[in-house]
Amino acid sequence: MIPMNKYQTELTEELMNTLPQEVQEQLLETLTTVEFVKRLISPNRPYARDLPRDEKGRIIVDITNPHIIEDADYFRQPALHFLKYGCYTFLKPNSNPNSEFRRHWDEEKRRCYEGYVRESDGEWVTGFNYWFMNYCPMMVNKLIEGRKKAIRTEAFPFFFEGIYWRFHYLWQAREGGKHAIELAKRGCAKSYSLAAIMSHNLILGESEESNRRVITVLTAYQKEYLKDDKDGTLSKFKPSINFSFANTPFPHLMLKNSPNEMSWQMGYKDEYGVEKGSLNQVLAVSAKDDSEKLR
């Protein structure tokens, strides 16, 4: 049989005999001819510790030849703390820049911008991925012991390597000044990933250098793929920002919050009516047959 790394299901003769002949042939053809699949199952698939690092100590991620990811919960500690205790920290609110509370949240914001690196092996997640995993609850299916059916409940995202690849792909495209495109099946958190990027850019901005007057535009051919009342992407975006407003000290004052117009803007007006704050915006536009709407 085909040699594989220890994380794959062993392809035994017994297992193969449970499959129809046609499926056996298709499976073997895929495992032996599709280069990406061959790299995923290879006994020589690298670990993070085997990869070269950049000047910041981060591994150089090759999404065409993915490495094996270990101990992914290392990057989900805020989410795991919230799931266990119902809060992100036991530190008491304190606006003093030198307080533990302020330092804690300044570090969290830095990770949401720059990503988070594990020094021991250089493994890292991008800032958007860190925000997605720790500050963007989503509806997940959970199996309960003793019950046959799963329950649908709100929780934080699990770590999936496909989503890890997605965010690294987007980061590499952005850093390289290029566009990005993804073709994907249903049910792989595309809308939740987009919603996370939108809420990140609205509340924090894109980066430490670009955190004011950032405009993020979500577009789709038909409006129903956007709207929050038809399971569109906005139905994932709105709970995300509301959760952040309720549970973090990140900015929460809004100049505009209009689901009907599909438009949101951070900021506030002072006593003189002057608009203050980041003024970051999120807009959703249905292009339909008129691409000029996106101008």
Per-segment meaning from a language model:
Residues 1-295:
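Phosphate/NTP-binding elements of NTP-utilizing enzymes
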